[in-house]
C-alpha cells in the first residue's frame, strides 16, 4: 500500500528492509510517517510477531485504511494476536502459520478479524483475505474457505465464504433472510480481482449495504477451463445485503423474463449504496437491446434501468464493462463495441462512452490492446485501462491508451490523455515538439504487491482542478537527461513540467499527491537534499509548495544504517514550489485561480477558468471584448470574448492572429490573482471564416 492523506500530512508505505521502528525485524512491513513542525515521524504498523519461527515470509501487507489514516486493514501470516493459532507443523521444529486478516488502529494492538464470533482461538489451518470495510472500519469483510458460522454449509475446494466482522461478532454475508446460505459455491464481494475490477463501493459508507456475487469465481479460475464443481456452473448473480434483508438486484424485471444465460457482473455502486451498476449479457428489462449491457438498480424504488441505450446493430450494445464512475453515480464511463451515439464510434471497436442521466455520449475509440479479456468476461486485464482517473464531479477523465486519441502520432506507445465534457481531448504526455515518441506514459508504476491490488486506493493523478501527475520515460523538457522514468505534472492550458530532477540513474516514480496538489510524493534513488546519504536507496520525497525543513545536524552513518531514520528525511525543498507552481500564478500557492484553458470558435474565444471560492472573474485582451462574471462559489466557469472589428480586419488580412488574454480573479477577501493564456485565430484560404485554438 502506497498512499498519502488528502492533506498531504501523512504517508503510508511498505519497506522490505526493516526500519528501527520495526517490531518484527523480518519481512515486508507497512510504516506510517506523519509530518510535524520539525520533520517526519514514523511508526511501524503490526506488533511483534508471536510466531515461534519468524521469517521473511511473515510479511505484513497493508491493503486499506480509513481516510484519516487512523485504522489499517492488513493480511499477514505473522502471528500478531494470541487468538491466531491456525497453524500446521510442517516438520519437527517448524510450524507454518496461515494468512489472516487484521485491523489495527494507531496506538492500539492489532485485532484479529478473520475468526468466529467467540474468542476461542481458530486452529485451522485456513487462509483468509481482506475484502472491504465501512468508512470507519467498524465493519470489515473478509473471505475464507473455512466455515465460521452455523449457516456456512460445505462448499467445494477453492470456493470461499464472505463474512463481515463487527463489534458483535462475525456474520455470514451470503445468507438469506430465512438463515439459509445463498448458493452452493461461495460468494465474492463485488467481483473477482483477477478480472481486473476492484470492489468499487461494494460496501456502502456506513457498511449497511453490501453487494456481492454468487457463486464465487475462484473455483472457475482454479478449474482453468475444466469441469466445475456442482453448484459453481450456474450464471452469476449480484445480490445486496441491507441489514438483515437480502435481494437479487440483477433479477430480470421483464414482463415475460428471458432465460438467464450469461449472468451478471458487479461494476460499481454509489457511496451510500442507493444505486448499483452491473453488466449482463442477458435482457433484463423490456427496453434492453439484444445481448443486454449496462444496468442500474435503484435500491429505494426497486427499479432496474437499462443504461446502454442507442444501439441499432443486431449485436446490441456489447458492453465490455465500466471504466470509472463517480461516487454519486451521476457519471459512468464504460466501454462498448456497439454504436450508441448515432454513427459516432466504430462498430465492433472499443468505444468509450459517458453515461449521465438521460444520455449516452461517445468519448473516443480506444485501441483493441487497451481492452483485454482475461477470465472470460467483463472489462478485464490490462493495467492501463484500470488506471483511469476521473474528477469527483465526473466532468474530466484521465486515461492511458495506445490509440492516437489526438492528432499526435504515438505509434502504438501508451500515452496519457485528458478529456473533459466540453469535448476537448489533450495528450498530456506527448512530445510537445511533435517528434515521434521516445517513451511511454504511466500513472503509477510503484503499486506494491499485485495481490490485493483491487483494494489499493487510487493515487491522485488527476485533481479536481484538472491538474495531472504522470510518469514517462520520454524527455519532454530539455533538463530531463536520464533516459528513464521521471515524474511530470500538466496544468490545463499549459505544457508538461518536470517534477523530479531528470538526472537520477534509475529514474523516479509517482507515489501520490495531496487533494489540493500542494504535496506531491515521489520515490527516487537520487539524493535530492544533503540529508539523503543512504548511497542510492529508494526514498520518498515530498515535493511541496513552500519547501521543506531546515537541514538537521549531520549524523554519522552509511548505507543501510541510514535507511532506518526516515523521521529525519525532509521534504524536497530544492524541488518544491519553483517546479510545481502554476505558470503565471501570483497567489502564493493558494491556487485561487488554478487553471485556465479555452477554445477558439470563429471570431470568438471561450475561456474556461477554475476558481477556489466566491469572487469576480474577468478576462480581457487587445482586440477582444471584455468579459466579467461574479461567482458565488468555487468551481469551473466560462467567459466568452469576441474579436472587435479592427482585430477581425487584421485576421482577414493576415490569415492568422495571436492575442494574449489576461484572466483575473478577485476573491471576496484578499488580493487578486492573474493568469495569461494565448488565443491563436486562423482563417482558411478565402478568409471568410475563422478557426483556431488556445494555447497556455
Where is each model-derived feature located?
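Short glycine/proline/serine/threonine-rich loop/turn segments at secondary-structure transition edges
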Residues: 531-533, 647-658
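Glycine-rich loops and low-complexity Gly/Arg-rich segments
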Residues: 452, 521-523, 546-547, 652-655, ...
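Short edge beta-strand/strand-turn motifs with a hydrophobic/aromatic core
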Residues: 640-645
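Short acidic, gly/pro-rich beta-turn/loop elements at beta-sheet edges
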Residues: 438, 550, 617-619, 649-651, ...
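Conserved "turn/edge" positions that cap or connect secondary-structure elements
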Residues: 1-588
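Short strand-edge motifs at loop-to-beta-strand transitions and within beta-strands
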Residues: 635-639
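Extracellular glycosylation-rich, acidic/polar low-complexity regions of adhesion-
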Residues: 588-629, 656-696
Amino acid at each position: 500500500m502506497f498512499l498519502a492523506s488528502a492533506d498531504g500530512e501523512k504517508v503510508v508505505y511498505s519497506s522490505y528492509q526493516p526500519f528501527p521502528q520495526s517490531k518484527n525485524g523480518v519481512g515486508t512491513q507497512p510504516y506510517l510517517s506523519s509530518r510535524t513542525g520539525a520533520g517526519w515521524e514514523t511508526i511501524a504498523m503490526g506488533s511483534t510477531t508471536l510466531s515461534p519461527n519468524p521469517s521473511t515470509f511473515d510479511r505484513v501487507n497493508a491493503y486499506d485504511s480509513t481516510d484519516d489514516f487512523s485504522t489499517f486493514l492488513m493480511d499477514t501470516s505473522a502471528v500478531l494476536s494470541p487468538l491466531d493459532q491456525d497453524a500446521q507443523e510442517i516438520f519437527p521444529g517448524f510450524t507454518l502459520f496461515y494468512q489472516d486478516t487484521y485491523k489495527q488502529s494507531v496506538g492500539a494492538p492489532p485485532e484479529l478479524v478473520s475468526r468466529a464470533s467467540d474468542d476461542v482461538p481458530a486452529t485451522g489451518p485456513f487462509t483468509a483475505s481482506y475484502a472491504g470495510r465501512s468508512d470507519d472500519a467498524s465493519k470489515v469483510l473478509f473471505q475464507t474457505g473455512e466455515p465460521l458460522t452455523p449457516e456456512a454449509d460445505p462448499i467445494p475446494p477453492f470456493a470461499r465464504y464472505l463474512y463481515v466482522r463487527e463489534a458483535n461478532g462475525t456474520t455470514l454475508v451470503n445468507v438469506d433472510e430465512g438463515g439459509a446460505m445463498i448458493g452452493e459455491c461461495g460468494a465474492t464481494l463485488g467481483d473477482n480481482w483477477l478480472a481486473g475490477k476492484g470492489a468499487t463501493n461494494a460496501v456502502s459508507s456506513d457498511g449497511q449495504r453490501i453487494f456481492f456475487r454468487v457463486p464465487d469465481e475462484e473455483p472457475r479460475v482454479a478449474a482453468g477451463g475444466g469441469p466445475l464443481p456442482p453448484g459453481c456452473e450456474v450464471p452469476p448473480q449480484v445480490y445486496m445485503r441491507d441489514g438483515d434483508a437480502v435481494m437479487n438486484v440483477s433479477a430480470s424485471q421483464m414482463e415475460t423474463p428471458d432465460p438467464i444465460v450469461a449472468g451478471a457482473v458487479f461494476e460499481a455502486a454509489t457511496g451510500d449504496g442507493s444505486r448499483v451498476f452491473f453488466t449482463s449479457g442477458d435482457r433484463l428489462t423490456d427496453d434492453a437491446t439484444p445481448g443486454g449491457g449496462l444496468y442500474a438498480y435503484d435500491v429505494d424504488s426497486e427499479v432496474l434501468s437499462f443504461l446502454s441505450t442507442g444501439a441499432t446493430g443486431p449485436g446490441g450494445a456489447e458492453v465490455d464493462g465500466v471504466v470509472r464512475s463517480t461516487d454519486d453515480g451521476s457519471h459512468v464511463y464504460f466501454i462498448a463495441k456497439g454504436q450508441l451515439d448515432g454513427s459516432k464510434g466504430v462498430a465492433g471497436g472499443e468505444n468509450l462512452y459517458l453515461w449521465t442521466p438521460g444520455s449516452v455520449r461517445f468519448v473516443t475509440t480506444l485501441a483493441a490492446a487497451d481492452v483485454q479479456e482475461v477470465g472470460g468476461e467483463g472489462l478485464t486485464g490490462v493495467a492501463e485501462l484500470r488506471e483511469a482517473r476521473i474528477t469527483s464531479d465526473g466532468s474530466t477523465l484521465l486515461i492511458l491508451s495506445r490509440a492516437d486519441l489526438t492528432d499526435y502520432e504515438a505509434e502504438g506507445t501508451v500515452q496519457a490523455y485528458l478529456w473533459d465534457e466540453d469535448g476537448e481531448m489533450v495528450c498530456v504526455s506527448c512530445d510537445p515538439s511533435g517528434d515521434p515518441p521516445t517513451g511511454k506514459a504511466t500513472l503509477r508504476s510503484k503499486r506494491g504487491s499485485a495481490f490485493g491490488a483491487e483494494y489499493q486506493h487510487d493515487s491522485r493523478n488527476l485533481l479536481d482542478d484538472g491538474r495531472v501527475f504522470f510518469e514517462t520515460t520520454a524527455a519532454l523538457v530539455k533538463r530531463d537527461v536520464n533516459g528513464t522514468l521521471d515524474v511530470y505534472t500538466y496544468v490545463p492550458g499549459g505544457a508538461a513540467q518536470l517534477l523530479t530532477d531528470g538526472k537520477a540513474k534509475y529514474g523516479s516514480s509517482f507515489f501520490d499527491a495531496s487533494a489540493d496538489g500542494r504535496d506531491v510524493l515521489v520515490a527516487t534513488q537520487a539524493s535530492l537534499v544533503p540529508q539523503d546519504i543512504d548511497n542510492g536507496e529508494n526514498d520518498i520525497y515530498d515535493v511541496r509548495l513552500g519547501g521543506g525543513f531546515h537541514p538537521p545536524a549531520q549524523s554519522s552513518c552509511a548505507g543501510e544504517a541510514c535507511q532506518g531514520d526516515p523521521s529525519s528525511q525532509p521534504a524536497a525543498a530544492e524541488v518544491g514550489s519553483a517546479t510545481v507552481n502554476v505558470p503565471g500564478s501570483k497567489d502564493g500557492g493558494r491556487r485561487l485561480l488554478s487553471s485556465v484553458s479555452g477554445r477558439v470558435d470563429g471570431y470568438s474565444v471561450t475561456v474556461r477558468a477554475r476558481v477556489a471560492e466566491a469572487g469576480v472573474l474577468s478576462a480581457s485582451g487587445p482586440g477582444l471584448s471584455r468579459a466579467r462574471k461574479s461567482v458565488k462559489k468555487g468551481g469551473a466557469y466560462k467567459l466568452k470574448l469576441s474579436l472587435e472589428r479592427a482585430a477581425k480586419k487584421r485576421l482577414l488580412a493576415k490569415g492568422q492572429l495571436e492575442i494574449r488574454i489576461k484572466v483575473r480573479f478577485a476573491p471576496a477577501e484578499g488580493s487578486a490573482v492573474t493568469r495569461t493564456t494565448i488565443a491563436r485565430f486562423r482563417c482558411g484560404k478565402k478568409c471568410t471564416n475563422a478557426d483556431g485554438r488556445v494555447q497556455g
